[in-house]
Amino acid sequence: MEAEPPLYPMAGAAGPQGDEDLLGVPDGPEAPLDELVGAYPNYNEEEEERRYYRRKRLGVLKNVLAASAGGMLTYGVYLGLLQMQLILHYDETYREVKYGNMGLPDIDSKMLMGINVTPIAALLYTPVLIRFFGTKWMMFLAVGIYALFVSTNYWERYYTLVPSAVALGMAIVPLWASMGNYITRMAQKYHEYSHYKEQDGQGMKQRPPRGSHAPYLLVFQAIFYSFFHLSFACAQLPMIYFLNHYLYDLNHTLYNVQSCGTNSHGILSGFNKTVLRTLPRSGNLIVVESVLMAVAFLAMLLVLGLCGAAYRPTEEIDLRSVGWGNIFQLPFKHVRDYRLRHLVPFFIYSGFEVLFACTGIALGYGVCSVGLERLAYLLVAYSLGASAASLLGLLGLWLPRPVPLVAGAGVHLLLTFILFFWAPVPRVLQHSWILYVAAALWGVGSALNKTGLSTLLGILYEDKERQDFIFTIYHWWQAVAIFTVYLGSSLHMKAKLAVLLVTLVAAAVSYLRMEQKLRRGVAPRQPRIPRPQHKVRGYRYLEEDNSDESDAEGEHGDGAEEEAPPAGPRPGPEPAGLGRRPCPYEQAQGGDGPEEQ
């Protein structure tokens, strides 16, 4: 009886099965290795590389959109809740019925003090926190603190509102510094992924030309601020769809108001102490706060799940390894740079103008004359104007660099002159369209200011080792300006406008002076960034050269670098240096190397 052949031929077996399989490929020791482990026959390396970098670029766009949407939702929830909370707590009937003698006005004043005063200390800890947690995780942590502030409004007490307000004040500057750093890094990454062929030709250590990422930075900052300025409109949704139904009309709330605009003093002098016709039910308030809490949680998920890392893990290690003492000192050392000193007046004005939009135009000119029920629509006009005008920052792709920033300053200068001589009549609605136009135009100037400043800093300081320090300084000066506005809230409107006008003129002149120095080729004095001092031995540091070292490190190093070895192959295994262990290949070639103690 003849034996049946095996179902699967044995590899290398001789016999009647033959030396070839059904596909004609030789079996056994004669089988070609390329047929088994060779490249895919239809593999196109150039096409696969193009697809890979295309996915990388789409990932960068996803990061920018997620960070922008997260910032918009976070500030929309925060501003909307704070506005609704202050209006409810202002009404004395609401305070007496809901909270009795708990001292709600005192709690509100302490809460505002915590939000406005705490950021003054942010220069001391912001760079340390960003380097410790990393840019993305600092954003996530700060957004989480904003969500914590929202959650404390479920139980409004001194021991919930005031500590959460202090924590929120501590998170303001780190959030904005990390976001500015994040958007700038995304622009640099997008440029890297778009010009990968040029980088392959130049080598990984060759730095791209200075300012080459500027077009992408202009686009990304325009996208970010276009989203962010929509947060002012999102913040008015609780007011429009909920709180406006409970408000008195302007004839009641403005009954004792005698002067508005440039003739007003403080904030809403003579405004009625009762603004609510009926008190909102506690269940309705809980529903509104729950919706806001859900949106804040969504913002956290956006940052956590959709925002990728700003740096590679090895770069994060290098950024931390310069020493915590150096990280603490470097923001102060950057004051030596004349570019930053010339931009400080613009940083201060940037804080002044956004607070003036919310308190001066919206309250001193708007609510004072057309009533509290139109506050939301004034801020929506400001928001839409600013969001649309953020896209005007793209004009920097074709116009000289100073044009958008100076144009925004010019719009604000014109409006400030007009507001200085305008005093709207209380309880008269005929001039309400002027208020909406003024709010929208102020938003245009704000957008050009914010977009222009952030783009300018990203262009002037493109070294990854400096960006968190620079954006920390920028937003710290903004926080100082906001604190100054908080202290001077009781001043006469003419005094506020005069301070605004002087600061704006000084900022524009100082900025143009800086641009003139740059055109003359005056070299800025930048502090040296110390080289990373790694305390661990890991696979990342087996090689002597630092693959993540930037040109700034190489050019401005501390002079302790070793001479480069002569080019050309060296016979035998490379001897292990004093600072590293021999790799396994070297150990196999030349022994186990020096023994460790």
Curated annotation (Swiss-Prot):
Instruction: Tell me, using the record's free text, what induces this protein.
Output: Up-regulated by TLRs agonists.
User: What does the entry's PTM section describe?
Assistant: N-glycosylated.
One of its GO biological process terms is: cell morphogenesis
Q: Which GO terms describe its cellular component?
A: early phagosome; endoplasmic reticulum; endoplasmic reticulum membrane; endosome; Golgi membrane; lysosome
Q: What keywords appear on the UniProt entry? A: Adaptive immunity, Antiviral defense, Cytoplasmic vesicle, Endoplasmic reticulum, Endosome, Glycoprotein, Immunity, Innate immunity, Lysosome, Membrane, Phosphoprotein, Transmembrane, Transmembrane helix
User: What membrane topology term does the record carry?
Assistant: Multi-pass membrane protein
Give compartment(s): Endoplasmic reticulum membrane; Endosome; Lysosome; Cytoplasmic vesicle, Phagosome
Q: Per UniProt, what is one GO molecular function of this protein? A: Toll-like receptor binding
Instruction: Respond yes or no to whether keyword Endoplasmic reticulum is given for this record.
Output: yes
Q: What is the role of the protein in this entry?
A: Plays an important role in innate and adaptive immunity by regulating nucleotide-sensing Toll-like receptor (TLR) signaling. Required for the transport of a subset of TLRs (including TLR3, TLR7 and TLR9) from the endoplasmic reticulum to endolysosomes where they can engage pathogen nucleotides and activate signaling cascades. May play a role in autoreactive B-cells removal.
Disease per record: Encephalopathy, acute, infection-induced, 1, herpes-specific: A rare complication of human herpesvirus 1 (HHV-1) infection, occurring in only a small minority of HHV-1 infected individuals. It is characterized by hemorrhagic necrosis of parts of the temporal and frontal lobes. Onset is over several days and involves fever, headache, seizures, stupor, and often coma, frequently with a fatal outcome.
* Subunit comment: Interacts with TLR3, TLR5, TLR7, and TLR9 (probably via transmembrane domain).
**Which protein are we looking at?**
Protein unc-93 homolog B1
- Which organism is the protein's source? Homo sapiens (Human)
Q: Kindly list the organism's lineage.
A: Eukaryota, Metazoa, Chordata, Craniata, Vertebrata
